Regions:
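An often Trp-containing, charged/polar helix-loop segment at the C-terminal end
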Residues: 317-320, 324-370
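Phosphate/diphosphate-binding glycine-rich loops and adjacent basic-rich segments that engage nucleotide
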Residues: 244-255
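Short, surface-exposed amphipathic charged segments that create phosphate/polyanion-binding patches used
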Residues: 180-181, 249-251, 359
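Ligand-binding/active-site lining segments
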Residues: 240
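Secretory targeting and sorting signals
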Residues: 1-27
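N-terminal hydrophobic or amphipathic segments with adjacent small-residue motifs
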Residues: 7, 213, 232, 302, ...
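Substrate-binding/charge-relay-adjacent region of secreted/lumenal peptidase catalytic domains
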Residues: 25-237, 257-307, 313, 317, ...
Length: 379
């Protein structure tokens, strides 16, 4: 799987107009923005998180702290997609390594946006290791910020959902699969979000649990397939720029030559195997979301702006938790209810032999799938 560093020069005035007023320090010192992957590229048999941090940098290339939240906020996500609410459904987040400040940072995020507290003490939040015990893995600062991104997005899209965080010991697919099985075996879990990916491979049984929506990011390197999004029974989640405007150029997509075509995917994919994506949500780091994490990665912590399909996967998992149409394989319900999605018809993520795999258009396309949520009628 290819990984790339994306550097975009965006005027501070444009950034402020898109995401709220910049701090005085940003307005004075910052000249550009830098988008960078926070997790190391995956080795064989392992995955990397699909989070891209959007840092404002000064003329020396040093990140300028966000003193207040910047990026899309919970109210923006709820309004754009018709989400919000919830009734105690549990969304599980599977990631690698430990974020030691996950619960405290979640508290800061939810308090900032006037969301009800979600804590271990009140039964809303639970963190455990990959086998369901209190033994947690070692800290990894990149994955720690991925974890905060994931739990913040569930909080934004489904503020009354409970959150189960299962931390795999390492980023190997063997350990991540163990964590997914642990999440699936936990009573009350209705959706499991996986904001990571590695090279396309055959489906692992851990990602096949009827009655649970298992979502996965399609990747952040443009056209090309990643697992577990390529697995037939996983809902592959692509990405857009903004909420419904255009396909994001970094979203993964394609046609698997390894995994079989799910029965519910139609001829529109022009693919004899599993085609990515199924659906999509905001992912472009230049139209990113607000996240809070106090575990510093490369010297950066606090209020952050993130993009990548790591953003879109937990949003879609939350949509399934809210919609509740989980019988059998939830993706099948989505493919049968496309009128409840907003079609994305412009943009592309690269060059491909079959245009629908990499270019957005009317109906299904690779970068954005069937579209973005328009309420929860497709979920």
């Amino acid at each position: 799987m290819l990984r790339r560093l994306v550097i975009a020069g965006v005027a501070i005035g444009t950034l402020a107009a898109s995401f709220g007023a910049a701090t005085a320090a940003q307005a004075t010192n910052a000249t550009s923005v830098r988008n960078s992957h926070i997790c190391a590229a995956p080795t064989q048999g392992s995955a990397a998180c699909n989070a891209i941090r959007h840092d404002v940098v000064d003329s020396h290339g040093n990140p300028v702290p966000n003193l207040t939240p910047s990026g899309f906020k919970p109210a923006d996500i709820v309004a754009a997609y018709g989400l919000g609410g919830g009734a105690g459904q549990t969304v599980a987040i599977v990631d690698a390594y430990n974020d030691p400040t996950a619960e405290a940072d979640l508290g800061v995020y939810r308090a900032q946006f006037s969301l009800t507290a979600c804590t271990t003490a009140n039964g809303c939040f639970k963190k455990e290791g990959q086998t369901g015990t209190s033994t947690l893995p070692a800290k990894n600062t990149g994955w720690a910020q991925e974890i905060s991104l994931d739990v913040d997005m569930v909080s934004a899209a489904c503020p009354a959902c409970h959150i189960l965080l299962v931390e795999a010991t390492t980023s190997s697919f063997a350990n991540l699969a163990t964590a997914v099985n642990t999440a699936a075996a936990t009573p009350g879990v209705v959706a499991i979000s996986n904001s990571y990916g590695g090279s396309d491979q055959g489906e692992l049984s851990a990602y096949n649990h009827p009655g649970i929506a298992i979502t996965a990011s399609t990747g952040d390197a443009g056209y090309g397939m990643e697992s577990p999004a390529s697995f037939p029974h996983v809902v592959a989640v692509g990405g857009t720029t903004g909420f419904t405007t255009s396909a994001w150029s970094g979203a993964g997509s394609g046609c698997s030559t390894i995994n079989a075509k799910p029965a519910w995917q139609t001829a529109a994919t022009s693919c004899s195997g599993k085609a990515n994506a199924d659906v999509s949500a905001v992912a472009d780091p230049n139209t990113g979301v607000a996240v809070y994490d106090s575990t510093a990665n490369k010297g950066v912590s606090g209020w952050l702006v993130f993009g990548g399909t790591s953003v879109s996967s937990p949003i879609i998992a939350s949509a399934y938790a809210l919609g509740g149409n989980l019988a059998g394989y939830p993706a099948q319900y989505t493919w049968a209810h496309t009128t409840n999605l907003s079609d994305v018809t412009t943009g592309s993520n690269g060059t491909c032999t079959t245009s629908v795999w990499c270019k957005a258009g009317t109906g299904w396309d690779g970068p954005t799938g069937l579209g973005t949520p328009n309420g929860v009628g497709a979920f």
